[in-house]
Amino acid sequence: MSIFNLKKPKALGTGQMIQNGGISDKEVLSKLLGYRKSVVAGYRSLLVDDISSNIAFGEMYVSPKIDGELWFLIIDNGEAALSNTSGKVIFGDIPLLDEVKAQMSQFQGQSIFAGELYVATKDTRPRVSDLASALGGGPKAEVNKLGFAVFDVLHGGDSKSVMPLVEYAERLEMMQRIFEKGKRVKCVKTEVANTPEDAKDFYDSWVEEGNAEGLIIR
């Protein structure tokens, strides 16, 4: 039985979208809501000048912050879809989902990945306003520009490792392995920092000199 309720969809470019109520499985929806709550509770916003005084020495996983929205990639019973915590579901002939479907045999049962849904641009950094425009584009939506940067795993995995995995290093290794050949769906760029100065260097490279919105430190 599918966990999705895909009745009365609306066109989204070459694919389709359910505005709300697209997740019929309450346990799955609870996982999405619980993850979002834990992420929001765990975030602490810092100015770049505060990095040295607020970040402790020790191993950290540093990633560029992409200006998009938190969504979830869900693989279940041969289906692949994107959902947010409101049960808005994107499915069908969407290029990034087609990419996932092509590697369906890699996943072990139901798998759920958290990530940033964004609109890819060539010359500037992604902006959440572009995503809002794309998702509101109906039949004319440019879904070929949608990208998904995976940064965590909630459930499932592949033949080498499955959740639960307590250490982020283990989850990261799994994500990098599964999505290593992805073009539209990739594991977010992640580097190891050991000191506040290391973190500041990544900020300078990715934010000041690059197109990242900010820095995520785990």
Task: Locate predicted features.
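Exposed boundary/loop context
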Residues: 8, 14-15, 27, 35, ...
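Amphipathic alpha-helical
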Residues: 30, 186-218
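Short, motif-level signal for alpha-helix interfacial/capping segments enriched in acidic residues
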Residues: 45-49, 124, 128-133, 194-201
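Charged, flexible boundary elements
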Residues: 18-57, 62
